């Protein structure tokens, strides 16, 4: 297009050059404003400014058109103009992508003849409109556009183009983009027929954006009659074909009716009848000339394209009374407002200057024509489309100018607001730039002086850390706020250290850093088996945990509680689990903890405030998914003035809540759901019930002798030899010695005491070897100690202190000839006299003594129950029951229940046995220093009382456990494995337990059950048959016959004497 402008100037055709330059400038500026309007809310101000500049600059050239210099414009096809994408309002057209060269060549070959034909048609039309003159100097044979008189005042029917953003005003260019193929084809047909005209009307629904309408109610009835001045073909970013064109509105028109719509054309095509819509319209607009020839309407081809076609009529202004005071006042105020606006907006000022320079040659003058002035004001304004449409529809020039003045006032307000914002922004930018320059200069000065700024270094460190981390959105916001706050604090301020420490903790946590979980079942099993012997329940649970994670693709955090006696390996199995899962291990103990701040941290305002143990764990492990072992959770401190730690753990150990664990120090949620928590406890009785419900409990029982032997051989002995420096020595601790060690020295459920005794044995062996080899480790040449006094009584500064820089001794190589065998007989030399000299307290139990089984936090153990007569049976004795042995409330109730049951049972089985009528019984549980309680001694106490009542000793190799009801039902108990281990350790051969525990017995390992005869009792009769099955009814009735005969005789004698 620039080429055409230059060529027009060479030939001296100034009018044509002015017209082309106006079209070119208007198209570019209107298109730039349209592009800015698509940038969203953030570019609203820029779009508004661009729109105003576009409309205002275009108006300068529009005035020349109205003055006769140029009206209308030539329709420039794609091949007639230089590539320029500024005419497209919505998206800049671009060459189609993704097509091969051959397809492009084929399309160009097909399109070239059509375009040449269109060029010839357009040039011929221009030549006809301008009288046939053509520019001669490089004009390419193109003629001038038609003059004002050649713009048609009326067409029978024209295409209707809906506008979505704002209405068009006469005399002001507008860039429009269409996508509908039918509309594009129709426009091309108009250009080929040299009818570059259409009607543009504003859509009522702003959300709609389409190129055709089906109902006249979809648009406002008043629009403009516009000329297509240039077009450009292309595709948008989505690959759709598009046509950009620049419209020049000539006058206001009113849409009278719709002749054709896409919907009507589609229906007509479906009916495919001869008297269809298209044919009917052809006949309607076909006239016969005087010579009898038929003449077609030049725009009737639009009826076949499927676009919206309508009939228009001019929308003329009402007569203007130029002597009206109101009109003159409005004109004056509008001009003054333009003057004010030009003083604020430099762009508007340049536009008005350009208008003033040419206004003298234009008729009518825009500053003297209220109608043109109102259109100019509305055209350069950015307002609501409906309000602008109201200005377009107003026929009364005075009212139109008044409405346009409101828009100009708004523009002034917006310009003033923009000016204010610009000044404030410039002030802030200048201040920031000044501060930045001064800060950089200060930094340079300090660097030259060798003075390092601690605050800047800390901020740089925090920023460097933050770049390597993946902060969550809420943490990133807090970090930025605190870092900005730190940069504004002086190093001497108290808040400086608080904020610095807070940022240090935030950037020290492993945000977005996690260790890679290990999903190999074989590898995990190997790690667990190598570290621990037994513990099959725990190992199976961990392998199940890994298997689920492998199927899901991730291992979720869990809360596991390991419960068992001391020394069974609860803490060490936690370390093995972390190795099996390839997770970092962290342990902390909560035993005796009574301050909730240890869990959730202190408030940041306190001096020396720190986060809780969990945040420390994340910082130490540097992963988001460590394994944290909370040790001794059953020994948490009780509620006090410092809070309840157990309640603080409720949030942490709840899988549904620990995603947003809130540490008091950090004061923002931290995701702990990826952490695997393993808790340890010796008993469940002291763990709060709400806390216990949140954990998956796995019970670890004590070890039997065979398991302890294996653990000692595989783990304890090699570790003890290594720790005592006897790794290569020939020291042999035989299996028999280990068994003797367990029998005589270590009868606990775990192996902690066994480990201590083995270490003691090897320490004694190390001493014996060193003494046997007679090794003298005294230094060969030790410096003599001298005490030389200085002559003047002052120390000599040049004197150097004496030092003994002897080399470190090398490990001793023990000869192979040194050999020590530790046998059961020689254990006394290493460990002293045996602690336990017998398997049981009673090798032969008297009547009333029964071996019971108990389960404590130390594991299973035997508990004897003894019953004796407090005084001989006599006529003066009264029945009673006394119990001792530090029995708890539950065992006291069990003793009273057993006493009542025994009386009932004896009266039913042996009615003539009157023992309980006169017996004052004392029931005792040995080891009175140890508190005893629990619901599993019922059958043991009843058996002890019945043994005393029948005066029959029981088999010392029978052990029993189980609770008893008043009617003789044997109830289920817990700790069957631990009690079985204790029975076997004490030499029992028969074990009696409730029948409901039979499933627990079946689950026991074979080596635990080996050598024991199980008796599952449902009622006490089953227990009685095992203990007293050989007692006949006669024997049971006559046990105390002699004593009661004596009592009866004594009573008879006493009554006869009275």
Swiss-Prot record:
Q: Give me the stretches of Gly residues compositional bias.
A: 129-142
Under SMART domains, the record lists: AAA, LON
Cite the NCBIfam families for this sequence. Answer: lon
Presence of the UniProt keyword Protease in the record: yes
Kindly provide the name given to this protein in its UniProt entry. Lon protease homolog, mitochondrial
Region entry Disordered, spans: 72-151, 778-814
Amino-acid positions noted as binding ATP in the UniProt annotation, renumbered to this chain: 564-571
GO MF entries = ATP binding; ATP hydrolysis activity; ATP-dependent peptidase activity; sequence-specific DNA binding; serine-type endopeptidase activity; single-stranded DNA binding
Q: Which UniProt keywords apply?
A: ATP-binding, DNA-binding, Hydrolase, Mitochondrion, Nucleotide-binding, Protease, Serine protease, Transit peptide
Please explain the role this protein plays, according to its UniProt record: ATP-dependent serine protease that mediates the selective degradation of misfolded, unassembled or oxidatively damaged polypeptides as well as certain short-lived regulatory proteins in the mitochondrial matrix. May also have a chaperone function in the assembly of inner membrane protein complexes. Participates in the regulation of mitochondrial gene expression and in the maintenance of the integrity of the mitochondrial genome. Binds to mitochondrial DNA in a site-specific manner.
* Catalytic reaction equation(s): Hydrolysis of proteins in presence of ATP
- One Pfam annotation reads LON_substr_bdg
Q: Family assignment?
A: Belongs to the peptidase S16 family.
What Gene Ontology cellular-component terms does the record carry?
A: mitochondrial matrix
EC numbers on record: 3.4.21.53
Q: Which Gene3D superfamilies match?
A: 1.10.8.60, 1.20.5.5270, 1.20.58.1480, 3.30.230.10, LON domain-like (2.30.130.40), P-loop containing nucleotide triphosphate hydrolases (3.40.50.300)
Main localization category: mitochondrion
Sequence intervals crossing the membrane:
none
Q: Which GO BP terms sit in this record? A: cellular response to oxidative stress; chaperone-mediated protein complex assembly; mitochondrial protein quality control; mitochondrion organization; oxidation-dependent protein catabolic process; protein quality control for misfolded or incompletely synthesized proteins; regulation of mitochondrial DNA metabolic process
Quaternary context = Homohexamer or homoheptamer. Organized in a ring with a central cavity.
Concerning InterPro entries, the annotation shows: AAA+_ATPase, ATPase_AAA_core, Lon_bac/euk-typ, Lon_lid, Lon_proteolytic, Lon_Prtase, Lon_prtase_N, Lon_prtase_N_sf
Q: In which compartments does the protein localize?
A: Mitochondrion matrix
């Amino acid at each position: 297009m620039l080429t055409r402008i230059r060529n027009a100037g060479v030939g001296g055709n100034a009018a044509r050059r002015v017209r082309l330059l106006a079209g070119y400038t208007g198209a570019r500026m209107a298109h730039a404003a349209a592009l800015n309007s698509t940038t969203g809310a953030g570019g609203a101000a820029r779009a508004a400014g661009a729109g105003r500049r576009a409309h205002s600059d275009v108006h300068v050239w529009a005035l020349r058109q109205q003055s006769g210099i140029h009206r209308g414009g030539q329709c420039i096809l794609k091949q007639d103009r230089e590539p320029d994408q500024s005419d497209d309002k919505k998206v800049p057209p671009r060459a189609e992508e993704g097509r091969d060269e051959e397809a492009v060549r084929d399309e160009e070959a097909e399109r070239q003849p059509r375009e040449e034909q269109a060029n010839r048609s357009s040039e011929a039309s221009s030549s006809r409109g301008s009288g046939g003159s053509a520019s001669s100097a490089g004009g390419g044979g193109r003629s001038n556009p038609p003059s004002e008189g050649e713009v048609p005042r009326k067409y029978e029917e024209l295409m209707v183009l809906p506008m979505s953003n704002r209405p068009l005003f006469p005399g002001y260019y507008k860039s429009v983009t269409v996508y509908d193929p039918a509309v594009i084809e129709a426009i091309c047909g108009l250009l080929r027929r040299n009818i570059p005209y259409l009607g543009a009307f504003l859509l009522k629904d702003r959300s709609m954006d389409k190129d055709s309408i089906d109902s006249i109610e979809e648009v406002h009835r008043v629009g403009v009659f516009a000329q297509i001045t240039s077009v450009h073909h292309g595709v948008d970013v989505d690959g759709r074909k598009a046509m950009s064109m620049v419209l020049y509105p000539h006058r206001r028109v009113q849409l009278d009716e719709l002749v054709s719509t896409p919907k009507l054309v589609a229906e007509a095509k479906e009916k495919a009848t001869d008297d269809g819509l298209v044919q009917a319209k052809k006949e309607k607009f076909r006239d016969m000339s005087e010579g009898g020839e038929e003449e077609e309407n030049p725009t009737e081809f639009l009826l076949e394209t499927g676009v919206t076609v309508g009939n228009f009529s001019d929308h003329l202004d009402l007569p203007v009374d130029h002597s009206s005071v109101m009109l003159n006042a409005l004109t004056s105020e509008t001009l003054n407002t333009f003057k004010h606006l030009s003083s604020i907006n430099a762009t508007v000022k340049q536009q008005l200057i350009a208008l003033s320079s040419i206004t003298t040659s234009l008729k009518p003058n825009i500053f003297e024509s209220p109608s043109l002035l109102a259109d100019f004001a509305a055209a350069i304004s950015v307002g609501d489309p409906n309000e602008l449409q109201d200005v377009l529809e107003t026929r009364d020039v005075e009212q139109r100018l008044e409405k346009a003045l409101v828009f100009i006032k708004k523009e002034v307000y917006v310009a003033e607001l923009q000016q204010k914002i610009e000044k404030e922004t410039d002030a802030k930018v200048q201040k920031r730039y000044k501060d930045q320059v001064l800060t950089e200069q200060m930094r340079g000065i300090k660097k030259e002086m060798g003075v390092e700024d601690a605050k800047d270094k800390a901020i740089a460190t925090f920023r460097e850390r933050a770049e390597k981390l993946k902060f969550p959105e809420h943490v990133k916001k807090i970090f930025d706020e605190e870092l900005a706050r730190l940069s504004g604090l002086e190093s001497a301020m108290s808040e400086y250290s608080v904020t610095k420490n807070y940022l240090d903790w935030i950037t020290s946590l492993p945000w977005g850093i996690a260790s890679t979980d290990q999903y190999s079942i074989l590898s995990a099993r190997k790690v667990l088996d190598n570290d621990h012997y037994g513990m099959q329940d725990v190992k199976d649970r961990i392998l199940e945990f890994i298997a689920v994670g492998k199927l899901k693709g991730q291992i979720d955090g869990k809360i596991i509680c390991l419960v068992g006696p001391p020394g069974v390996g609860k803490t060490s199995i936690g370390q093995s689990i972390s190795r099996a899962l390839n997770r970092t291990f962290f342990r902390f103990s909560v035993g005796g903890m009574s301050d909730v701040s240890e869990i959730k941290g202190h408030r940041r305002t306190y001096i020396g405030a720190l986060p809780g143990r969990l945040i420390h764990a994340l910082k130490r492990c540097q992963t988001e998914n460590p394994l944290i072992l909370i040790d001794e959770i059953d020994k948490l401190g009780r509620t006090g003035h410092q809070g309840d730690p157990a309640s603080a753990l409720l949030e942490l150990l709840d899988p549904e809540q620990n995603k947003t664990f809130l540490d008091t120090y950090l004061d923002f949620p931290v995701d702990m759901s990826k952490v695997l928590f393993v808790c340890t406890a010796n008993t469940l009785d002291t763990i709060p019930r709400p806390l216990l419900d949140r954990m998956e409990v796995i019970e670890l029982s004590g070890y039997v002798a065979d398991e302890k032997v294996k653990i000692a051989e595989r783990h304890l002995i090699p570790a003890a030899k290594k720790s005592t420096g006897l790794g290569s020595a020939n020291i042999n601790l035989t299996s028999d010695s280990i068994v003797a060690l367990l029998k005589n020295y270590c009868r606990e459920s775990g192996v902690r005491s066994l480990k201590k005794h083995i270490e003691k044995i090897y320490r004694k062996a190390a001493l014996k070897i060193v003494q046997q080899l007679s090794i003298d480790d005294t230094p060969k040449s030790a410096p003599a100690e001298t005490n030389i006094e200085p002559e003047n009584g002052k120390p000599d500064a040049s004197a150097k202190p004496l030092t003994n820089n002897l080399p470190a001794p090398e490990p001793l190589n023990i000869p192979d000839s040194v050999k020590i065998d530790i046998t059961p007989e020689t254990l006394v030399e290493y460990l002293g006299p045996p602690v336990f000299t017998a398997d049981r307290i009673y090798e032969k139990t008297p009547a009333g003594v029964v071996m019971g089984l108990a389960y404590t936090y130390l594991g299973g153990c035997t508990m004897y129950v003894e019953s004796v007569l407090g005084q001989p049976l006599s006529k003066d004795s009264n029945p009673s029951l006394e119990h001792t042995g530090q029995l708890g409330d539950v065992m006291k109730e069990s003793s009273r229940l057993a006493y009542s049951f025994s009386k009932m049972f004896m009266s039913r089985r042996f009615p003539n046995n009157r023992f309980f009528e006169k017996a004052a019984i004392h029931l005792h549980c040995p080891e009175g220093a140890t508190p005893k309680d629990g619901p599993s001694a019922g059958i043991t106490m009843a058996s002890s009382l019945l043994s005393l009542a029948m005066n029959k000793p029981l088999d010392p190799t029978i052990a029993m456990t189980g609770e008893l009801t008043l009617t003789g039902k044997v109830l289920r108990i817990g700790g069957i494995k631990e009690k079985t281990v204790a029975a076997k350790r004490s030499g029992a051969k028969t074990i009696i337990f409730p029948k409901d525990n039979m499933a627990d017995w079946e689950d026991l390992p074979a080596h635990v059950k080996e050598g024991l005869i199980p008796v599952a009792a449902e009622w006490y009769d089953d227990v009685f048959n095992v203990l007293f099955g050989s007692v006949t009814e006669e024997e049971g009735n006559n046990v105390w016959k002699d004593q009661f005969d004596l009592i009866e005789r004594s009573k008879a004698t006493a009554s006869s004497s009275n």
